[in-house]
């Protein structure tokens, strides 16, 4: 019996890519393979060969706040060996690597930090971008719509009354969201950033955020059930139908003419009309005589019309043919 079992074990078909794979006793389930290990000074023994720098402009209204906060910014970046320069004349912020910089990715985080500060994100929130696992995304919404009134209306729809819609999105996506001018600054995990970008762009394309909020709430409840981890959630998610609202009909309906590749004929000029009628060939005296005759005819017609109106006053009114009833 044991020989049969051993023969069946040896005859098990193994995929080509797993043929030479061996068991790894050190690889246990409690190890998180996606965890980002912190980068310390011991990991980088030598300084960088080249200096890297990034610069960004900021609006005039941010100048006062940045001047107050800049000492805190320099202190935060000194921990990573990065210098920063605030140019108030040019209106720009610059970050540079130094010989003390040990983390090569920290310069990219510093670049994101000055971008967020320029987009009105407060410093205590913006400095969190220097942490591992925190990313940012600046979504441009100004070039999606042409009509300014419609843009303001849809941007307000994203914020909601007293910022309730924005707060709900922050709780569901676990991201920090700030709507400022024609951009939306988002901070959080990569999964949350992807969801927020989709919601913001859909809102600008006239899809209300409440539909996405309902969907995210259902997904959060489904994630708690381990039995549904490997199943499709489409049957649980709501399917919203698009409604084509009847538009108001225009007051004047213009008739579309048939398309012709040839341009319309040129209308006849005054000279052409005179040649056709033969008036062009008349003498000056004859032309004046003709005009006088036409004028006299017009005067006669007007005189007749006025006489008719005067005679209306002398016409007696029609008496009623009904006889009065006797008492």
Curated annotation (Swiss-Prot):
Keywords in alphabetical order: Nucleus, Ribonucleoprotein, Ribosome biogenesis, RNA-binding, rRNA processing
Cellular component per GO, a single term: small-subunit processome
Pfam families, per database record: KH_KRR1_1st (PF17903), KH_KRR1_2nd (PF21800)
InterPro entries named in the record: KH_dom_type_1_sf, KRR1-like_KH1, KRR1-like_KH1_euk, KRR1-like_KH2, KRR1-like_KH2_euk, rRNA_assembly_KRR1
Primary location recorded for the protein, binned into one broad class: nucleus
Composition bias, Basic and acidic residues: 294-312
SUPFAM superfamilies in the cross-refs: Eukaryotic type KH-domain (KH-domain type I)
GO molecular function: RNA binding
Keyword Nucleus included in the entry's annotation: yes
Record has Oxidoreductase as a keyword: no
Domain of life, source organism: Eukaryota
Compartment(s): Nucleus, Nucleolus
Annotated region described as Disordered, given as residue ranges: 247-274, 286-327
Boundaries of every KH domain copy: 135-205
GO BP annotations listed: rRNA processing
Family in the record: Belongs to the KRR1 family.
Role played: Required for 40S ribosome biogenesis. Involved in nucleolar processing of pre-18S ribosomal RNA and ribosome assembly.
The protein's assembly and partners: Component of the ribosomal small subunit (SSU) processome.
Protein name: KRR1 small subunit processome component homolog
């Amino acid at each position: 019996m044991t020989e049969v079992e051993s023969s069946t074990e040896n005859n098990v078909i193994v995929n080509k890519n797993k043929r030479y794979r061996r068991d790894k006793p050190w690889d246990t389930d409690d190890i998180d393979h996606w965890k980002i290990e912190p980068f310390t000074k011991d990991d980088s023994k030598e300084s960088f060969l080249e200096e890297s720098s990034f610069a960004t402009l900021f609006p005039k209204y941010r100048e006062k706040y940045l001047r107050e906060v800049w000492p805190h910014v320099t202190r935060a970046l000194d921990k990573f060996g990065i210098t920063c320069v605030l140019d108030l004349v040019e209106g720009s912020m610059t970050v540079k690597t130094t010989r003390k910089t040990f983390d090569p990715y920290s310069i990219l985080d510093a670049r994101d930090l000055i971008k967020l500060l320029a987009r009105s994100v407060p410093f205590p929130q913006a400095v969190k971008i220097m942490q591992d696992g925190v990313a940012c995304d600046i979504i441009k919404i100004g070039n999606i719509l042409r009509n300014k009134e419609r843009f303001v209306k849809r941007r307000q729809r994203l914020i909601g009354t007293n910022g309730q819609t924005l707060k709900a999105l922050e709780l569901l996506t676990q991201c920090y969201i700030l709507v400022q001018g024609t951009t939306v600054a988002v901070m959080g995990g990569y999964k949350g950033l992807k969801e927020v970008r989709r919601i913001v762009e859909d809102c600008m394309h006239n899809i209300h955020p409440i539909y996405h909020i309902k969907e995210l709430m259902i997904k959060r409840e489904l994630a708690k059930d381990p039995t549904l981890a490997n199943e499709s959630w489409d049957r649980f998610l709501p399917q919203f139908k698009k409604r084509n609202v009847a538009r108001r009909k225009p007051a004047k309906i213009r008739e579309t003419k048939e398309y012709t590749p040839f341009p319309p004929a040129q209308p006849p000029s005054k000279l052409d009309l005179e040649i056709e009628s033969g008036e062009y060939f008349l003498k000056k005296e004859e032309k004046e005589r003709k005009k006088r005759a036409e004028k006299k005819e017009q005067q006669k017609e007007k005189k007749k019309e006025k006489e008719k109106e005067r005679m209306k006053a002398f016409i007696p009114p029609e008496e009623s043919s009904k006889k009065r009833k006797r008492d």
